[in-house]
């Protein structure tokens, strides 16, 4: 499969994959959670630098609050948090007198909190198969629907970064009628390391460079 890849990134990579037939296009959206805009200036990121040089590098303004769940669901729906319902990683539900939390599966998996229409549902309405790896909302029955292929966040075993890439590549190797044309892939780093160690630290720098190497693996394969 020939791959023509362009990039627009802050914490987000957009990979456009063009298959052998020119009329069939594949898009892989990759999130490196917590990847600061200036990390490529602070640390060695040759793969991201190469993608920016080959394609496009653009400014992205996050939605507010700039937290994982509201921002990733904004990217999926095109709606700001107060319109799509996920207004923070944790918030108080006044109507039902309970707390929503990304760490509480009972509320996190409740579709009544998720408004709007994620892009994978829109794509499937157009007859496009989709694949989703750990993106916010993808394992929840929003509008009684799931992506064609997806991995629940609480499924065991929890996949390593390398296993996630292998799974995505397996999806892309399916026979064309079964192959997802829209794939969304989430990595929770370097967010965790940045919070724990601070952005200007050797451990965070090592994680940033590791995430860059994974982008290189995804491009190469």
Question: What feature does the model see in each segment?
Answer:
Residues 20-23, 50, 55, 105, ...:
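Coil residues (strongly favoring Ser/Thr
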Residues 20-23, 42, 66-68, 124-125, ...:
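Extracellular/periplasmic catalytic domains that process cell-envelope and extracellular macromolecules
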Residues 24-36, 50-51, 75, 123, ...:
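Beta-strand elements within well-structured catalytic alpha/beta cores of enzymes
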Residues 24-29, 37-45, 64-69, 109-116, ...:
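Solvent-exposed, acidic/flexible segments
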Residues 40-84:
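Short, structured active-site-proximal loop/turn typified by the sulfatase FGly-forming signature C/S-X-P-X-R
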Residues 1-23:
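Bacterial Sec-dependent N-terminal signal peptides
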Residues 80-207:
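His/Asp/Glu-rich, glycine-adjacent segments
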Residues 171, 218-221:
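Generic, well-ordered alpha-helical scaffold segments in large soluble proteins
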């Amino acid at each position: 499969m020939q791959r023509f890849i362009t990039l627009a990134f802050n914490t987000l990579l957009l990979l456009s994959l063009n298959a052998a037939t020119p009329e069939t296009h594949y898009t892989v959206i990759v999130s490196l959670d917590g990847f600061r805009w200036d990390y490529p200036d602070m640390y060695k990121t040759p793969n991201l630098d190469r993608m920016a040089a080959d394609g496009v590098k653009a400014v992205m303004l996050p939605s507010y609050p700039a937290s994982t769940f509201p921002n990733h669901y904004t990217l999926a729906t095109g709606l700001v948090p107060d319109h799509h319902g996920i207004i923070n990683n944790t918030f108080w539900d006044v109507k039902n007198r309970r707390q929503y939390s990304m760490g509480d599966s009972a509320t996190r998996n409740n579709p009544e909190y998720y408004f709007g229409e994620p892009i994978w549902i829109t794509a499937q309405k157009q007859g496009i198969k989709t694949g989703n790896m750990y993106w916010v909302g993808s394992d929840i029955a929003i509008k009684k629907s799931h992506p064609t292929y997806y991995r629940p966040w609480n499924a065991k075993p929890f996949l390593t970064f390398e296993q996630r890439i292998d799974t995505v590549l397996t999806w892309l190797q399916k026979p064309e009628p079964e192959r997802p044309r829209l794939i969304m892939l989430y990595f929770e780093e370097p967010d965790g390391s940045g919070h724990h160690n601070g952005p200007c630290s050797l451990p965070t720098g090592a994680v940033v460079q590791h995430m860059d190497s994974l982008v290189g693996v995804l491009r190469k394969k």
